[in-house]
Protein backbone atom coordinates (compact mmCIF):
# COMPACT_ATOMS: atom_id res chain seq x y z
CA UNK A 1 0.00 0.00 0.00
CA UNK A 2 1.36 3.43 -0.97
CA UNK A 3 2.06 5.79 1.90
CA UNK A 4 -0.14 8.83 2.15
CA UNK A 5 1.68 12.14 1.71
CA UNK A 6 2.15 14.23 4.80
CA UNK A 7 0.32 17.12 3.15
CA UNK A 8 -3.02 16.22 4.78
CA UNK A 9 -1.74 16.87 8.27
CA UNK A 10 0.14 19.96 7.07
CA UNK A 11 -3.06 21.36 5.58
CA UNK A 12 -4.81 20.89 8.90
CA UNK A 13 -1.98 22.63 10.71
CA UNK A 14 -2.15 25.42 8.14
CA UNK A 15 -5.88 25.85 8.76
CA UNK A 16 -5.33 25.90 12.52
CA UNK A 17 -2.57 28.48 12.26
CA UNK A 18 -4.68 30.54 9.90
CA UNK A 19 -7.52 30.43 12.40
CA UNK A 20 -5.16 31.59 15.13
CA UNK A 21 -4.00 34.46 12.94
CA UNK A 22 -7.61 35.43 12.19
CA UNK A 23 -8.52 35.44 15.87
CA UNK A 24 -5.48 37.54 16.69
CA UNK A 25 -6.03 39.89 13.78
CA UNK A 26 -9.62 40.84 14.59
CA UNK A 27 -10.06 44.40 15.76
CA UNK A 28 -12.38 45.47 18.52
CA UNK A 29 -16.05 45.98 17.73
CA UNK A 30 -16.84 49.20 15.96
CA UNK A 31 -13.74 49.56 13.78
CA UNK A 32 -12.74 53.20 13.66
CA UNK A 33 -15.72 54.13 15.80
CA UNK A 34 -14.98 51.88 18.78
CA UNK A 35 -11.34 50.93 19.17
CA UNK A 36 -10.65 48.73 22.18
CA UNK A 37 -7.09 49.51 23.24
CA UNK A 38 -7.79 48.76 26.90
CA UNK A 39 -10.66 48.00 29.22
CA UNK A 40 -11.26 51.62 30.18
CA UNK A 41 -11.48 53.10 26.71
CA UNK A 42 -13.79 50.35 25.46
CA UNK A 43 -16.61 52.19 27.28
CA UNK A 44 -16.30 55.19 24.96
CA UNK A 45 -17.35 55.80 21.38
CA UNK A 46 -14.63 57.13 19.09
CA UNK A 47 -15.17 58.65 15.65
CA UNK A 48 -12.35 59.79 13.38
CA UNK A 49 -13.85 62.64 11.37
CA UNK A 50 -10.87 63.77 9.29
CA UNK A 51 -7.27 62.76 8.66
CA UNK A 52 -5.02 65.14 6.73
CA UNK A 53 -1.39 65.02 5.66
CA UNK A 54 0.55 68.22 6.24
CA UNK A 55 4.10 69.18 5.34
CA UNK A 56 6.70 71.54 6.74
CA UNK A 57 9.51 72.91 4.58
CA UNK A 58 12.89 72.69 6.32
CA UNK A 59 16.47 73.11 5.19
CA UNK A 60 16.79 69.47 4.16
CA UNK A 61 13.48 69.35 2.28
CA UNK A 62 9.95 68.61 3.47
CA UNK A 63 8.82 66.89 6.62
CA UNK A 64 5.43 65.20 6.44
CA UNK A 65 3.09 64.54 9.33
CA UNK A 66 -0.58 63.71 9.86
CA UNK A 67 -3.40 65.42 11.73
CA UNK A 68 -6.54 63.70 13.01
CA UNK A 69 -9.83 65.19 14.20
CA UNK A 70 -11.42 62.77 16.68
CA UNK A 71 -14.73 62.75 18.55
CA UNK A 72 -15.02 60.77 21.81
CA UNK A 73 -18.14 60.30 23.92
CA UNK A 74 -19.83 57.92 26.33
CA UNK A 75 -23.10 57.83 24.38
CA UNK A 76 -24.92 59.19 27.42
CA UNK A 77 -24.49 62.96 27.38
CA UNK A 78 -20.69 63.30 27.59
CA UNK A 79 -18.64 64.25 24.51
CA UNK A 80 -15.34 65.87 23.60
CA UNK A 81 -13.37 66.87 20.49
CA UNK A 82 -9.64 66.39 20.03
CA UNK A 83 -7.09 67.31 17.38
CA UNK A 84 -3.89 65.26 17.21
CA UNK A 85 -0.74 65.65 15.13
CA UNK A 86 2.07 63.11 14.69
CA UNK A 87 4.35 61.52 12.11
CA UNK A 88 2.10 58.45 11.88
CA UNK A 89 -1.68 58.19 11.59
CA UNK A 90 -2.24 55.91 14.64
CA UNK A 91 -0.19 58.24 16.84
CA UNK A 92 -2.14 61.26 15.60
CA UNK A 93 -5.44 59.52 16.37
CA UNK A 94 -4.21 58.54 19.84
CA UNK A 95 -3.26 62.14 20.60
CA UNK A 96 -6.66 63.31 19.36
CA UNK A 97 -8.42 60.81 21.61
CA UNK A 98 -6.49 61.95 24.67
CA UNK A 99 -7.23 65.61 23.94
CA UNK A 100 -10.93 64.84 23.42
CA UNK A 101 -11.14 63.00 26.74
CA UNK A 102 -9.60 65.99 28.52
CA UNK A 103 -12.23 68.28 26.98
CA UNK A 104 -15.37 66.33 27.93
CA UNK A 105 -18.50 68.38 28.60
CA UNK A 106 -22.09 67.47 29.50
CA UNK A 107 -24.93 67.83 26.97
CA UNK A 108 -28.45 68.34 28.46
CA UNK A 109 -30.71 65.66 26.99
CA UNK A 110 -34.35 64.71 27.50
CA UNK A 111 -35.39 61.31 26.15
CA UNK A 112 -32.60 61.25 23.59
CA UNK A 113 -33.03 64.75 22.17
CA UNK A 114 -31.85 68.27 23.04
CA UNK A 115 -33.80 70.64 25.28
CA UNK A 116 -34.40 73.49 22.80
CA UNK A 117 -33.38 74.77 19.34
CA UNK A 118 -29.92 76.27 19.20
CA UNK A 119 -27.44 77.58 16.64
CA UNK A 120 -23.68 77.35 16.96
CA UNK A 121 -20.95 79.13 15.04
CA UNK A 122 -17.22 78.48 14.68
CA UNK A 123 -15.10 80.25 12.07
CA UNK A 124 -17.11 79.92 8.84
CA UNK A 125 -19.18 77.00 10.16
CA UNK A 126 -22.79 77.53 11.25
CA UNK A 127 -24.93 74.63 12.50
CA UNK A 128 -28.60 74.73 13.52
CA UNK A 129 -29.89 72.03 15.89
CA UNK A 130 -33.56 71.38 16.62
CA UNK A 131 -35.20 68.82 18.94
CA UNK A 132 -37.08 65.94 17.34
CA UNK A 133 -39.73 63.47 18.47
CA UNK A 134 -38.81 59.86 19.36
CA UNK A 135 -38.17 57.71 16.30
CA UNK A 136 -36.92 60.54 14.10
CA UNK A 137 -33.28 59.52 14.29
CA UNK A 138 -30.20 61.66 13.80
CA UNK A 139 -30.87 63.76 10.70
CA UNK A 140 -27.46 65.33 10.17
CA UNK A 141 -24.42 65.33 7.92
CA UNK A 142 -21.39 63.16 8.53
CA UNK A 143 -19.30 65.54 10.65
CA UNK A 144 -22.20 66.76 12.80
CA UNK A 145 -23.60 63.23 13.06
CA UNK A 146 -20.36 61.97 14.60
CA UNK A 147 -20.56 64.54 17.39
CA UNK A 148 -24.25 63.96 18.07
CA UNK A 149 -24.01 60.16 18.12
CA UNK A 150 -21.03 60.17 20.47
CA UNK A 151 -22.96 62.54 22.75
CA UNK A 152 -25.86 60.07 22.94
CA UNK A 153 -28.39 62.08 20.92
CA UNK A 154 -30.87 59.72 19.25
CA UNK A 155 -33.43 62.11 17.73
CA UNK A 156 -32.47 65.49 16.30
CA UNK A 157 -32.66 67.68 13.21
CA UNK A 158 -29.37 69.33 12.25
CA UNK A 159 -28.56 71.59 9.32
CA UNK A 160 -25.29 73.19 8.27
CA UNK A 161 -25.84 76.81 7.22
CA UNK A 162 -22.22 77.77 6.59
CA UNK A 163 -18.97 76.15 5.53
CA UNK A 164 -18.94 72.46 4.62
CA UNK A 165 -15.43 72.01 6.00
CA UNK A 166 -15.56 69.09 8.44
CA UNK A 167 -13.45 70.83 11.08
CA UNK A 168 -15.63 73.95 11.02
CA UNK A 169 -18.83 71.88 11.15
CA UNK A 170 -17.58 69.85 14.12
CA UNK A 171 -16.59 72.92 16.11
CA UNK A 172 -19.86 74.69 15.23
CA UNK A 173 -21.82 71.64 16.42
CA UNK A 174 -19.86 71.58 19.67
CA UNK A 175 -20.48 75.31 20.12
CA UNK A 176 -24.21 74.73 19.68
CA UNK A 177 -24.27 71.88 22.21
CA UNK A 178 -22.44 74.02 24.76
CA UNK A 179 -25.17 76.68 24.45
CA UNK A 180 -27.89 74.25 25.54
CA UNK A 181 -29.49 74.94 28.92
CA UNK A 182 -31.62 72.85 31.24
CA UNK A 183 -35.12 74.12 32.08
CA UNK A 184 -34.10 74.40 35.75
CA UNK A 185 -31.25 76.76 34.84
CA UNK A 186 -33.52 79.05 32.82
CA UNK A 187 -36.18 79.08 35.56
CA UNK A 188 -33.61 79.91 38.25
CA UNK A 189 -32.13 82.75 36.18
CA UNK A 190 -35.54 84.28 35.53
CA UNK A 191 -36.87 83.67 39.03
CA UNK A 192 -39.90 81.79 37.71
CA UNK A 193 -41.38 78.35 38.35
CA UNK A 194 -40.14 75.72 35.94
CA UNK A 195 -43.73 75.23 34.70
CA UNK A 196 -43.70 78.81 33.35
CA UNK A 197 -40.47 78.25 31.44
CA UNK A 198 -40.62 74.76 29.92
CA UNK A 199 -43.47 73.31 27.81
CA UNK A 200 -45.69 70.75 29.50
CA UNK A 201 -44.60 68.08 27.01
CA UNK A 202 -40.94 68.60 27.89
CA UNK A 203 -41.64 68.36 31.62
CA UNK A 204 -43.63 65.18 31.11
CA UNK A 205 -40.84 63.66 29.04
CA UNK A 206 -38.35 64.70 31.72
CA UNK A 207 -40.37 62.98 34.45
CA UNK A 208 -40.70 59.82 32.37
CA UNK A 209 -36.98 59.80 31.62
CA UNK A 210 -36.11 60.24 35.30
CA UNK A 211 -38.53 57.46 36.24
CA UNK A 212 -36.94 55.08 33.73
CA UNK A 213 -33.46 55.94 34.97
CA UNK A 214 -34.49 55.36 38.58
CA UNK A 215 -36.07 52.01 37.70
CA UNK A 216 -32.93 50.91 35.84
CA UNK A 217 -30.74 51.90 38.79
CA UNK A 218 -33.01 49.98 41.17
CA UNK A 219 -32.81 46.85 39.00
CA UNK A 220 -29.02 47.05 38.89
CA UNK A 221 -28.86 47.46 42.67
CA UNK A 222 -31.18 44.48 43.18
CA UNK A 223 -29.11 42.34 40.80
CA UNK A 224 -25.96 43.05 42.78
From Swiss-Prot:
One of its GO terms (cellular component) is small ribosomal subunit. Gene3D superfamilies: 3.30.160.20, 3.30.230.10. Residues 44-107 form the S5 DRBM domain. The keyword S-adenosyl-L-methionine does not apply. Transmembrane segments: none annotated. Residues 13-40 have a biased composition (Basic and acidic residues). InterPro entries: Ribosomal_Su5_D2-typ_SF, Ribosomal_uS5, Ribosomal_uS5_bac-type, Ribosomal_uS5_C, Ribosomal_uS5_N, Ribosomal_uS5_N_CS, Ribsml_uS5_D2-typ_fold_subgr. It comes from the Bacteria. GO terms for molecular function: rRNA binding; structural constituent of ribosome. Coiled coil: none annotated. One of its GO terms (biological process) is translation. Residues 1-40 are annotated as: Disordered. Pfam families: Ribosomal_S5 (PF00333), Ribosomal_S5_C (PF03719). Keywords: Ribonucleoprotein, Ribosomal protein, RNA-binding, rRNA-binding. Part of the 30S ribosomal subunit. Contacts proteins S4 and S8. HAMAP family: Ribosomal_uS5_B. With S4 and S12 plays an important role in translational accuracy. Located at the back of the 30S subunit body where it stabilizes the conformation of the head with respect to the body. Belongs to the universal ribosomal protein uS5 family. The N-terminal domain interacts with the head of the 30S subunit; the C-terminal domain interacts with the body and contacts protein S4. The interaction surface between S4 and S5 is involved in control of translational fidelity. This is Small ribosomal subunit protein uS5. It comes from Mycolicibacterium paratuberculosis (strain ATCC BAA-968 / K-10).
Amino acid sequence: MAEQPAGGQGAGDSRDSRGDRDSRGRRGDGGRGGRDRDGDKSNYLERVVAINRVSKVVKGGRRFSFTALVIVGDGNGMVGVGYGKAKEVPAAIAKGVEEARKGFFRVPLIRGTITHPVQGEAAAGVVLLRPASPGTGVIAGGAARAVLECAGVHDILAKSLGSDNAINVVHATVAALKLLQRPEEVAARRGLPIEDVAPAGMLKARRESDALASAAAAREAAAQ
